[in-house]
């Protein structure tokens, strides 16, 4: 493994509409082929739909709540010990937790059948707020894997 200097984290600028860095990261995950204006419109419109469905609430707060519901507490990592590979349960850092939650919500939204990405994203965010949907299922599967491999938790590093 290379022993290079530690690469500094890039600073994420806050969102122009709501002043939230989490929202900026989410827009960047939705973005395809560098079309940020399109991605922003999709995310803002989807959040408007979610706020209307929930009858109130702050846009950024609802997004954070959805991400909190979808983010996993534990995940499994492969660890090789004496020729055998074990799936070792490991706690998830908060940054990785939100990154995984965003990734899972975007993936689940892209697989949905509604017409237009805005409606698909709105549907997935609504489902995430109500603890249902594909992204929540992915979280539960991850937790189930960690629970099943709890016996190997002493291999943690």
Curated annotation (Swiss-Prot):
InterPro entries associated with the record: Ribosomal_uS7, Ribosomal_uS7_bac/org-type, Ribosomal_uS7_CS, Ribosomal_uS7_dom, Ribosomal_uS7_dom_sf
GO cellular component: small ribosomal subunit
Subunit composition and interactions: Part of the 30S ribosomal subunit. Contacts proteins S9 and S11.
Keyword vocabulary terms for this entry: Ribonucleoprotein, Ribosomal protein, RNA-binding, rRNA-binding, tRNA-binding
Family, per entry: Belongs to the universal ribosomal protein uS7 family.
Keyword field contains Ribonucleoprotein: yes
Known role: One of the primary rRNA binding proteins, it binds directly to 16S rRNA where it nucleates assembly of the head domain of the 30S subunit. Is located at the subunit interface close to the decoding center, probably blocks exit of the E-site tRNA.
Superkingdom, taxonomy of origin: Bacteria
One Pfam family here: Ribosomal_S7
GO biological process, one term: translation
GO molecular function, one term: tRNA binding
Protein name: Small ribosomal subunit protein uS7
């Amino acid at each position: 493994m290379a022993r290079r200097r530690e690469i500094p984290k890039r600073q994420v600028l806050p969102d122009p509409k709501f002043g939230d860095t989490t929202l900026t990261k989410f827009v960047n995950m939705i973005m395809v082929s560098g079309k940020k204006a399109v991605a922003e419109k999709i995310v803002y419109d989807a959040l408007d739909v979610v706020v209307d469905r929930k009858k109130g609430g702050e846009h950024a707060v609802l997004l954070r709540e959805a991400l909190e519901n979808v983010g996993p507490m534990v995940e499994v990592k492969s660890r090789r010990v004496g020729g055998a590979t074990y799936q070792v349960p490991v706690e998830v850092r908060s940054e990785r937790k939100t990154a995984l939650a965003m990734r899972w919500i975007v993936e689940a939204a892209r697989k949905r059948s509604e017409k237009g990405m805005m409606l698909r994203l709105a549907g997935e965010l609504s489902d995430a707020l109500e603890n249902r949907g594909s992204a929540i299922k992915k979280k539960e599967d991850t937790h189930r894997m960690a629970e099943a491999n709890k016996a190997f938790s002493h291999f943690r590093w």
